[in-house]
Swiss-Prot record:
Protein name, UniProt field: Aquaglyceroporin
Natural source organism: Toxoplasma gondii (strain ATCC 50611 / Me49)
UniProt feature coiled coil, ranges: none
Primary role: Mediates water and glycerol transport across cell membranes. Permeable to selected sugar alcohols of up to five carbons and urea. Permeable to methylamine/methylammonium.
Record-linked PANTHER family: AQUAPORIN-8
Length: 263
C-alpha cells in the first residue's frame, strides 16, 4: 500500500540518487546491481504478503478472533509500510500495484507483473503458515447472512477505493509530510474496512483459495471468492478515476495515458 509506492516502488524512483556512481560502473556490474535492487523490491512484497496472511491466522486463533484479526492485520500493515516503503514502495496488494502502474510511468509492466506474482506467492505461503497455526485452512471471508453477492461487493469496493484514493492524494498531492502519515492513513482505512467485512487484498484471497484447494477443502463459497478477489480491483479503478477527477489537474502527476499540465 505507500510511500505507497512511489519512490522505491517505481522502476527508477529508488535509483535516482545513484546515477552518478552507476555511470562509473561497467555495464555488466550495472545490470547486476539493477537486478539485485529489483529482487530486493520483489522480496519485500513477497515477505509482506506472507506476514499479512499469517497475521490473519494469528488473530483468528485467539479467543474473540473476529475482533482480534482486524487489529492484528492493521498493526502488521502499519509496521510493514514503515519498514518497506522506501524499498519496494510497500504495495503489498495487487490492486494497489495496478493503480500505481496507471499513475507512475516509471513503474513498468515488468514491475507490475513481478510485484503481483510476488504478492500472490507470498499470500499463498502465508496461507499455508496459517494452516499450520489454525490446524485447518483459513476460510475465504464469507458473505454476510442474507446478503447478496452484489450488495457484498460494496463492502470490498468502498473501503478499497477510500484507502487507495487517500494514498494517491497524500503521496502525489502534497510535498513534505510526516513520515508516518501514509502508514497511519492506510492503517485506519484497513481497520475500518476489516470491521466492515472487507478483505481489500486479492493476494490474501488468492492464497487462502490455493491453500483450500491443496488441502482438499471443497467447501468454498464461489460468490464470496469472486467478490473478495475482484472487488478490490474495482475499488482501485474508482479510486484512480476519483483522483483524476479531483486532483490530477491542480496537482499534476505523470499519468501513463494522460498529461495534465496543471495551473
Amino acid at each position: 500500500m505507500d510511500q505507497f509506492v512511489f519512490s522505491g516502488g517505481s522502476e527508477g524512483g529508488g535509483e535516482l540518487g545513484g546515477d552518478r556512481e552507476r555511470d562509473s560502473l561497467t555495464p555488466e556490474l550495472g545490470r547486476f546491481e539493477h537486478l539485485i535492487f529489483n529482487m530486493q523490491k520483489y522480496f519485500c512484497e513477497f515477505f509482506a504478503a506472507l506476514v499479512i496472511v499469517s497475521a490473519v491466522a494469528f488473530g483468528l486463533a485467539k479467543e474473540g478472533g473476529a475482533q482480534a484479526a482486524p487489529l492484528s492485520i492493521t498493526s502488521t500493515i502499519f509496521a510493514l509500510i514503515t519498514l518497506f516503503k522506501d524499498i519496494s514502495g510497500a504495495h503489498f496488494n495487487p490492486a494497489v500495484s495496478c493503480t500505481i502502474y496507471m499513475t507512475d510511468p516509471r513503474f513498468t509492466l515488468v514491475d507490475l507483473l513481478c510485484y503481483v506474482a510476488a504478492q500472490l506467492i507470498g499470500g499463498t505461503v502465508g496461507a499455508f503458515i496459517g494452516y499450520g497455526i489454525m490446524g485447518k485452512a483459513l476460510d475465504i471471508l464469507p458473505l454476510d447472512p442474507g446478503m447478496s453477492a452484489s450488495r457484498q461487493l460494496f463492502h470490498e469496493v468502498i473501503p478499497t477505493m477510500v484507502m487507495i484514493y487517500a494514498v494517491l492524494v497524500l503521496v502525489f498531492g502534497y510535498g513534505v509530510m510526516w513520515e508516518l502519515t501514509v502508514p497511519f492513513v492506510v492503517g485506519a482505512c484497513v481497520l475500518a474496512g476489516a470491521f466492515a467485512g472487507a478483505t481489500m487484498n486479492p493476494a490474501v484471497t488468492f492464497g487462502i483459495f490455493i491453500s483450500n484447494i491443496c488441502t482438499k477443502n471443497t467447501n468454498i463459497d464461489v460468490a464470496a471468492l469472486l467478490v473478495t478477489l475482484f472487488g478490490p480491483f474495482l475499488g482501485a479503478m474508482f479510486a484512480f478515476l476519483g483522483y483524476v477527477g479531483t486532483h490530477a489537474y491542480h496537482n499534476p502527476v505523470p499519468l501513463r495515458f494522460l498529461n495534465f499540465r496543471g495551473l
